[in-house]
């Protein structure tokens, strides 16, 4: 069974087979083998989880789509030769096992009366197909999710599953129960969230949320009793020096006030810890005597002491 790294490494080892595919260069221009392997994995995972078969693509008149079909076919042949499976192929095999074997499907359905799925906004197409396949005609399915927290699109998840869920049932069959009380977050965070969703909707951002979320306003479980604000704005313009300085001052204020007993109580969340903006902030903090732990940032070999040792 291949995890994400194993999968990419397997493609990397066989990159010559993919590069020999006709019109390969249309889909993946010249580049490093590792990057091409990563792109191939993304393509085959997304196609597989949408239940797309290679033959469907290979017969297309569009050369790039036909090339994608050949890439998917080659990838599956490599899996078969090595008797290997990845996460997407597990889902595919499960789907076909149930779809093509009525006895097995009926036996499973006889043991399942209700299906409950949490974090439904993070499910993909094939997972929804499996859920409805197992539920059968009864469709006793309960799903819980938040369309504003659809974070796993990069792994094939689609927000359409939760937005269009009621449409999978006849009129009156699907009951929607809004869960608008937030028991986890400080009321200041909840208020900021509501203001943010309102502010980003409309002409200013050239975007309308109405097609991508259920209309709602979240309420905090209780009003915050903290004297300190839960949400702080540290930069108003795209000025790196101002951003660095404000963050440093904010951390120092937390430490001096006793709200921090150790700098390791501070965590930063970024899309990528390797982004130049992020590594620049880390270097700035370390220059100001605040150590940063970020093992995936590739900063290790940039440290003076490591360069001297090498």
Residue ranges and their predicted role:
Residues 108-125, 142:
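SF2 helicase catalytic motif II
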Residues 125-234:
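Conserved RecA-like helicase ATPase core segment
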Residues 7, 83, 87-90, 185, ...:
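Phosphate/oxyanion-binding active-site loops and adjacent basic polyanion-contact surfaces
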Residues 245, 252, 256-310:
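Core RecA-like ATPase module of SF1/SF2 helicases and allied nucleic-acid translocases
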Residues 1-3, 15-31, 54-60, 78-83, ...:
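Short, polar/flexible loop-turn hinges at active-site or ligand-entry regions and domain interfaces
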Residues 98-115, 136-137:
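Short basic/glycine-enriched coil/helix segment immediately N-terminal to the Walker B
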Residues 1, 6, 10-14, 130-133, ...:
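Alpha-helical scaffold elements adjacent to nucleotide-binding pockets in ATP/GTP-utilizing enzyme cores
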Residues 1-93, 102, 110, 139:
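A basic/glycine-biased coupling hinge at the interface between accessory DNA-binding modules
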